[in-house]
């Protein structure tokens, strides 16, 4: 029984949300939504798609977090993009290409928690490998291929057990930093069935890692698209997300032993 007990104890230390004695706090992990071969939601006029936008601006989020003294890693589950502008932006941000794209919404079991299966699991598993302090999936939202007439409700989705405070912090930052589009924004905790496509949220919960999915702006709402196409405003959005993460980090310090 002793070897089994030791394995359980080690698992709790490594994956239970704390930092093992003598270990440095892990990084903030950002994940670029989708990949070059499946770019995610796009605006009806083709001006914005999720993958291209976050290729360009994930580095801005990372830079703000690192400037505050925290380590940060940017992941993308696919291969390096062929587009030169996207590739240069990814290189500048130091994006770690995981080379395991979600082809046809294929689902993978977690290597750490195989009972949890989902698309994008490779990114969650990498965050667990890195002992991430928290994880932010950078996305843009959409309700379909037609323009919305009314302002949609922005969402900050989070894993149910651990993500609420991080989500509330990002939500508060949005209301302050991008008030013109954030008054109706809300936090949506989710518990996903183990076989569902977003089961990676449960794997991160099991690993003790707070996680949020940024889905606050919509690519099929014209005012949002106009905002996202403005470089200065897009950078403001990236800095605002970083501000929300930093506020949470300051409330949850991890001291090095």
Language-model features: where?
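Positively charged n-region of N-terminal signal peptides that target proteins for export
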Residues: 1-7
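Active-site-adjacent mobile loop/cap segments within catalytic or ligand-binding domains
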Residues: 26, 48, 140, 144, ...
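Mature extracellular/periplasmic domains of secretome proteins
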Residues: 119-130, 201-206
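A short, glycine/acidic-enriched catalytic loop
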Residues: 39-48, 141-169
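Solvent-exposed, polar/charged alpha-helical surfaces in well-ordered, non-transmembrane soluble domains
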Residues: 51-59, 63, 67, 117, ...
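Structural recognition of the beta-strand scaffold that forms the well-ordered cores
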Residues: 27-32, 72-76, 104, 133-138, ...
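Active-site histidine-acidic residue metal-binding/catalytic motifs
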Residues: 23-122, 144-145
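Bacterial N-terminal signal peptides
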Residues: 7-17
């Amino acid at each position: 029984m002793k070897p089994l007990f030791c394995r359980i104890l080690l698992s709790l230390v490594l994956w239970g949300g704390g930092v093992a004695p003598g270990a440095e706090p892990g990084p903030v992990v950002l994940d670029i939504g989708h990949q070059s071969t499946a770019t995610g939601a796009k605006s009806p006029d083709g001006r914005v798609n999720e993958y291209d936008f976050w290729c360009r601006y994930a580095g801005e989020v990372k830079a703000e977090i690192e400037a505050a003294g925290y380590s940060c890693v940017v992941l993308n589950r696919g291969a390096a993009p062929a587009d030169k502008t996207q590739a240069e932006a990814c290189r500048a941000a130091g994006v770690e290409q995981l080379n395991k794209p979600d082809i046809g919404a294929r689902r993978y079991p977690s290597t750490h928690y195989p009972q949890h299966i989902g698309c994008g699991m490779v990114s969650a598993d990498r965050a667990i490998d890195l002992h991430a302090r928290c994880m932010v999936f950078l996305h843009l939202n959409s309700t379909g291929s037609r323009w919305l007439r009314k302002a949609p409700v922005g969402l900050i989705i989070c894993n149910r057990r651990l993500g609420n405070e991080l989500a509330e912090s990002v939500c508060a930052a949005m209301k302050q930093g991008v008030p013109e589009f954030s008054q109706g924004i809300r936090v949506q905790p989710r518990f996903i069935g183990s076989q569902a496509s977003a089961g990676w949220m449960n794997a991160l919960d099991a690993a003790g890692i707070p996680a949020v999915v940024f889905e606050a702006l919509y690519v099929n709402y014209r005012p949002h698209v106009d905002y996202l196409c403005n470089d200065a405003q897009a950078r403001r959005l990236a800095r605002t997300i970083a501000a929300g993460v930093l506020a949470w980090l300051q409330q949850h310090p991890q001291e090095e032993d």
